[in-house]
Amino acid sequence: MKLSKNDDIKLNIDSLTSEGSGIGRFDGFAVFVRGVVPGDEVVAHIIKCSKNYAIGVVKDIIKPSEFRIESDCPVSSKCGGCSFRNVSYDEELRYKKGRVQDALERIGKLDIEVEEIIGADKCSHYRNKAQYPVSICDGELFAGFYAYKSHRIICNDDCALQPKEFKAGLEAFRIWAEKANVTSYDENTGKGLLRHIYFRKGFATGEIMACAVINGTSIPERDLLVSLLREKLQGLKSVVININREKSNVILGKESKTIWGDDYIRDKLLGKTFVISPNSFYQINHDQCEKLYSKAMEYANLNKNETLLDLYCGVGTIGSVSYTHLRAHETCADL
């Protein structure tokens, strides 16, 4: 049977793509379906059919996989931010290990046994940074994340991956936008003021930065925004506007202005303190980062007679947490 658009077919999902879409085969023909789990038996509705593959959406789950779990996010099926919220964590780790093993063997032609993945102790509310695109509907600001392969915003002010404080920060921005008649940026026209709302948190210090990314040089009622953020956002240390007037989908511009508090927040990794600005590169998952760096230092087995070059290093976390093991170190972000 030849597949055509709008066909409904039964599929057994046997694997996943790197982006988390399920793969099933219909008479040997690959069909990609989002939101499914290996082991699922589903009815898929075909929405695109090409010479070598088809894309479908789930119409019905006939028999759920043993690895399927209930997603803890009400918008995970629409939002493009997560791929594995409906898969057990053990199965997710097994799949990711398999992807690494396959890449080494099939692409790298290397005969290397991949060790077990060191999993996270915390799979929710672990991210220390969030960048929310915004829009305004009927005079009210809403923020969220882009739908899968789209710039359509899925409203989500309570993401399961972000610190709970960020929700309170979004509420402060919503009230300010309504009272100050703030317009949202339109990518098609290049008009509108507010492009993104951006938060950073130091997990070890509790310090939070709130940032408005704007298509302009200033914001209306800035004292009101600061007052609302200070009232609602526990741990607030910095309020910044980032200026991005480019007609592009790049989130941050090169210039930032602090309108309250410090120009940065602080965080600690493995006992070392780091200063983080709006544009700093810094690892997203604090606790997993500490595990990663500790394991890297264990494997490197550095000694006092060695010199470590820390290149393309963001805020220099790897070199800084390693230098106590060394005679000298060089941190250079621009080399």
Model-based region annotation:
Residues M1-R327, A333:
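Accessory RNA-recognition modules of RNA-modification enzymes
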